[in-house]
Amino acid sequence: ICSTVIPMLKIGIDAMGGDYAPHVVVEGALMALRHIDSDSRLVLFGDEGEIRRVMEEHGAPSDTFDIVHTTEVITMDDHPAKAYNQKTDSSIRVGYKYLKEGKIDGFASAGATGAMLVGAMYSAETIRGVIRPAISALISTLDGGSFLLLDVGLNVDCKPDVLDQYGLIGSAYAEAVLAKANPRVALLNIGEESEKGNLTTKAAYELMADNGCYNFVGNIEANEIFTGRKADVVVCDGFVGNTILKQTEGFYELARMRGINDDYIDKLNYEFVGGTAVLGINAVVLIGHGRSS
């Protein structure tokens, strides 16, 4: 009788990423241990002394995690490419090194998004044919469903062919992972008509309409995306997508401050989203919200 031996799954975590690192990252890793298989192992990258202090505060045994000590951190104020190349002992850079060498099976960080993009491009590498990877956000809609928004911050400037490709990537992800049959793909714009928008969106519209590899339903305006009536996938550049995402978060916080209790509004809480996958690369990379607790 032949048996298949499943190797131990090693998940890499940037312990220094996020506004409240390393405390909340280590605490989150300890919480995650309750939900992952016993044959999986968490590998934390960061200042070993700080990581172990948090572990001791929670009474965690010293062998709870594999810890890779690093001495540098790429901050939000750093230039992404320069910092990634110069801070060779940063938690992000070393984490990607381990991912490339196959020492971990996936890497997650709530740190600098720009540096994570650089690492995804040059360490994880893009899938053949992909121009630029993207990150997406799954946002709840009023009809009880959700839509996929991409890009939400990895590429603030996108050429028309990149937006067209995001339509294909988003469609494939929505179908394979979100189980949406023939997902409807729309381009976020200032009007529904094909001639609306700037030079980039006008050119992108033509490419998307002619693509034929996914179900393009045309332009969609921002006031329609939360209804769920028109699109399952909404495409935009990272500047616009991140603005939509932050506006959604701001609306949630404003509603809570006003004492509004509503099941739908609660679904807009970014704390409920552990992270989002980087789409279009040959590795499993997750980017978390920097403000997450």
Task: Provide a role label for each language-model segment.
Residues I6-R52:
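N-terminal phosphate-binding or glycine-rich loops at protein starts, especially the Walker A/P-loop
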Residues I13-H23, Y84, L154-D164, L286-S293:
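Short, glycine-rich nucleotide/cofactor-binding loops
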Residues A21-V25, D89-G102, G106-A120, I131-I135, ...:
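Short glycine/serine/threonine-rich phosphate/pyrophosphate-binding segments
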Residues H23-V24, I36-V43, V156-A222, D232:
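Glycine-rich phosphate/diphosphate-binding loop of Rossmann-like nucleotide-binding domains
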Residues A60-I104:
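Phosphate/nucleotide-donor binding subsite
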Residues L99-L117, E195-K196, T201-L268:
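Glycine-rich phosphate-binding loop
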Residues M121-G145, L149, T227-S293:
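Glycine-rich phosphate/nucleotide-binding loop
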